[in-house]
From Swiss-Prot:
InterPro entries: Acetyl_CoA_COase_a_su, ClpP/crotonase-like_dom_sf, COA_CT_C. Acetyl-CoA carboxylase is a heterohexamer composed of biotin carboxyl carrier protein (AccB), biotin carboxylase (AccC) and two subunits each of ACCase subunit alpha (AccA) and ACCase subunit beta (AccD). Pathway: Lipid metabolism; malonyl-CoA biosynthesis; malonyl-CoA from acetyl-CoA: step 1/1. It comes from Clostridium beijerinckii (strain ATCC 51743 / NCIMB 8052). The keyword Phosphoprotein does not apply. Component of the acetyl coenzyme A carboxylase (ACC) complex. First, biotin carboxylase catalyzes the carboxylation of biotin on its carrier protein (BCCP) and then the CO(2) group is transferred by the carboxyltransferase to acetyl-CoA to form malonyl-CoA. Belongs to the AccA family. This is Acetyl-coenzyme A carboxylase carboxyl transferase subunit alpha. It catalyses: N(6)-carboxybiotinyl-L-lysyl-[protein] + acetyl-CoA = N(6)-biotinyl-L-lysyl-[protein] + malonyl-CoA.
Length: 272
């Protein structure tokens, strides 16, 4: 085994800290590193252009794809520009516009997800935040093109799920995926936000936990200590995962693909 990828044991809370690390590679980094000839598209054709979600067309190993990412940015000015990775409804509508375009032109879709959730501001609610997320869930469940989603950092709440109704769902080894943050879990269930470490363990939010529940399809190994320790290596492993999955999905009948995708999500949580 490559010494950079030697297994180390981390607690669920340590995975949260790694997932939130300020130097963790962003979705934008993976787009720039893994794909060629990326052309970004803007706007939802209704209200505006949400910078928390970037998307466009690109190629990977001579396969034309649509690529979309919820991204937080990598410095203070980027954090503000990207709204700390919390999309507004126009972001989700932009993503859906690009996905419908991908369906029309028979391009597979690759989604990178890193968000603490959809933006909960008054303006977002007035512009239909819940409806935008619900519409994405509905449309993605029947979209006639292969979809691959990767949780690269945080994947929390419906804001993450809105880009994760996919044929293949992967998590980076130290990413997290949950209905809410450990802080929210501890505050709501125990009325004690100081119990975040306990909440992280109880909520089963790690890649290992979710693979055990068949919520995700695979775990993408990270370099020792996290993706931020060696972003280039991480991107190489992630690229291979994406290419292998694309080749597998492209061989499947579209109707079978849609049926499998729909049933995958209908069966989630059905453990008996």
């Amino acid at each position: 085994m490559d010494k950079d990828f030697m297994k180390i044991n981390v607690t669920p809370w340590e995975s949260v800290e790694i997932a939130r690390h300020k130097d963790r590679p962003s979705g934008q980094y993976y787009i720039e590193t893994i794909f060629k000839d990326f052309i970004e598209f803007h706007g939802d054709r209704n209200f505006g252009d949400d910078q928390a979600i970037i998307g466009g067309i690109a190629s990977i190993n001579d396969i034309n794809v649509t690529v979309i990412a919820i991204t937080k940015g990598s410095n203070t000015s980027e954090y503000i520009k990207r709204n700390f990775g919390m999309p507004n409804p126009e972001g989700y509508r932009k993503a859906l516009r690009l996905m419908k375009q991908a369906e029309k032109f028979k391009r597979p879709i690759i989604c990178f997800i890193d968000t603490m959730g959809a933006f909960p501001g008054m303006g977002a609610e007035e512009r239909g935040q819940g409806q935008a997320i619900a519409n994405n869930l509905f449309e993605l469940s029947r979209l006639k093109t292969p979809i691959i989603s990767i949780i690269t950092g945080e994947g929390e709440s419906g804001g993450a799920l809105a880009l994760a109704v996919a044929d293949k769902i992967f998590m980076l080894e130290h990413s997290i995926y949950s209905v809410l943050s450990p802080e929210g879990f501890a505050s709501i269930l125990w009325k004690d936000p100081s119990r975040v470490k306990e909440a992280a363990a109880v909520a089963k939010i790690t890649a290992k936990d979710l693979k055990g529940f068949d919520i995700i399809d695979g775990i993408v190994k990270e370099p020792r200590g996290g993706a931020h320790k060696n972003p280039v290596k991480t991107a190489e492993v992630l690229k291979k995962t994406i290419v292998d999955s694309l080749l597998e999905l492209k061989e499947k009948d579209l109707n079978e693909l849609i049926d499998n995708r729909y049933n995958k999500f209908r069966d989630m949580g059905n453990f008996y």
